[in-house]
Amino acid sequence: MVAMFQEDNGTSSVASSPLQVFSTMSLNRPTLLASSSPFHCLKDLKPEERGLYLIHLLLTCANHVASGSLQNANAALEQLSHLASPDGDTMQRIAAYFTEALANRILKSWPGLYKALNATQTRTNNVSEEIHVRRLFFEMFPILKVSYLLTNRAILEAMEGEKMVHVIDLDASEPAQWLALLQAFNSRPEGPPHLRITGVHHQKEVLEQMAHRLIEEAEKLDIPFQFNPVVSRLDCLNVEQLRVKTGEALAVSSVLQLHTFLASDDDLMRKNCALRFQNNPSGVDLQRVLMMSHGSAAEARENDMSNNNGYSPSGDSASSLPLPSSGRTDSFLNAIWGLSPKVMVVTEQDSDHNGSTLMERLLESLYTYAALFDCLETKVPRTSQDRIKVEKMLFGEEIKNIISCEGFERRERHEKLEKWSQRIDLAGFGNVPLSYYAMLQARRLLQGCGFDGYRIKEESGCAVICWQDRPLYSVSAWRCRK
């Protein structure tokens, strides 16, 4: 990974990322480096030195939080607050959001204090702001553009010759994807099909805006078109609301949605563990079950780490554990399989942020968000208010959820393509390799974006979008096995 470091004279120079350097160092004992140094001396550190120092502080702070040593965690947070900055260089900006997340996690350990501090704060669902931030992400990163292109290409190839097509969008928040599909269908030699799009979103206003844009474009192209809005959270969706009709060729598009079901699976697993203990208390580890029942299943193994400075051996990592045998994820995928789609295209974060311990998630998410912040650093000025909005309202909120939340509250449970492939395969789907033409178009799109650090890697017929060598997102296509 390569990062841009801005010198005092305002020019930029390319240097090794602090995380790249840090990854070659020993992780056995993260300690407070020069903990007695005056804060004013810390300000004089060179960018790379400061980046390394911030990483050590974050890991040390997280280690103290995990072990319950809150006084030491507070000391680390104080140093972090003097070095981290939401408008500084890449590592300072990342550290600012991880620092906030760790502090928030500490506050949550005192529910009374946490609730009292938040009692007078009102959360407003500003729909226009949410749409604006999603649009900024779409414009600043090529991720969604590539996802939409590959999804549309898979749909077009699956629907060749079909006269009635129904597309279900499980996150109907961005009309750009379907505007492009309308234009592509209009260019078919045999003419466009009758197209029906069902959009699922929890906010009515978002669906209304999408419907207006798509109906307007369909009328302009003279394509027979219907839009079916479904106002619902995905985890509350009843498949009957999708109104799938006999004779329609069905396609399903899921962009960054399936991972939200994993929180329900974790909640179900904790309840099942508690039930097994009630039925057979002598056969279950009492301490672990009690910890799970208090909403911290992922904390059940934190004590095992205290003698290893907060780092779990690789054999304990979440990626090596078997998939849950049942849950909301399986039920939802089974329900989609029951609709018999000709193709289902899934885009997900290709990261392992669903580790069972805080330290696992912190390390993995540090690397992922460092790559995402690097992407912005190479293209968008540091003073850009739009960049700050994306970092704070999108990435910052994801980081906070990954680090400070547990149990059902922790919804940003990103996992690797390998695990999603296992789940989808078990639900009765077979992989449809993305076509050579689709991959060629996607690579051309990346080249046209002017982001030299992006590349697309093919993995078992799927596309993995990377920044440098770091996988960020995956796109895979599936069809029902008979």
From Swiss-Prot:
<feature type="region of interest" description="SAW">
    <location>
        <begin position="404"/>
        <end position="479"/>
    </location>
</feature>
<dbReference type="GO" id="GO:0003700">
    <property type="term" value="F:DNA-binding transcription factor activity"/>
</dbReference>
<keyword id="KW-0539">Nucleus</keyword>
<feature type="compositionally biased region" description="Polar residues">
    <location>
        <begin position="305"/>
        <end position="324"/>
    </location>
</feature>
<keyword id="KW-0804">Transcription</keyword>
<dbReference type="GO" id="GO:0005634">
    <property type="term" value="C:nucleus"/>
</dbReference>
<dbReference type="Pfam" id="PF03514">
    <property type="entry name" value="GRAS"/>
</dbReference>
<keyword id="KW-0805">Transcription regulation</keyword>
<protein>
    <recommendedName>
        <fullName>Scarecrow-like protein 3</fullName>
    </recommendedName>
</protein>
<feature type="domain" description="GRAS">
    <location>
        <begin position="45"/>
        <end position="479"/>
    </location>
</feature>
<comment type="function">
    <text>Probable transcription factor involved in plant development.</text>
</comment>
<dbReference type="InterPro" id="IPR005202">
    <property type="entry name" value="TF_GRAS"/>
</dbReference>
<feature type="region of interest" description="VHIID">
    <location>
        <begin position="134"/>
        <end position="199"/>
    </location>
</feature>
<dbReference type="GO" id="GO:0006355">
    <property type="term" value="P:regulation of DNA-templated transcription"/>
</dbReference>
<feature type="region of interest" description="Leucine repeat I (LRI)">
    <location>
        <begin position="52"/>
        <end position="115"/>
    </location>
</feature>
<feature type="short sequence motif" description="VHIID">
    <location>
        <begin position="165"/>
        <end position="169"/>
    </location>
</feature>
<dbReference type="GO" id="GO:0009739">
    <property type="term" value="P:response to gibberellin"/>
</dbReference>
<comment type="similarity">
    <text>Belongs to the GRAS family.</text>
</comment>
<feature type="region of interest" description="Disordered">
    <location>
        <begin position="302"/>
        <end position="324"/>
    </location>
</feature>
<feature type="region of interest" description="PFYRE">
    <location>
        <begin position="250"/>
        <end position="401"/>
    </location>
</feature>
<feature type="region of interest" description="Leucine repeat II (LRII)">
    <location>
        <begin position="209"/>
        <end position="241"/>
    </location>
</feature>
<comment type="subunit">
    <text>Binds to zinc finger proteins MGP/IDD3, IDD4, IDD5, BIB/IDD9 and JKD/IDD10.</text>
</comment>
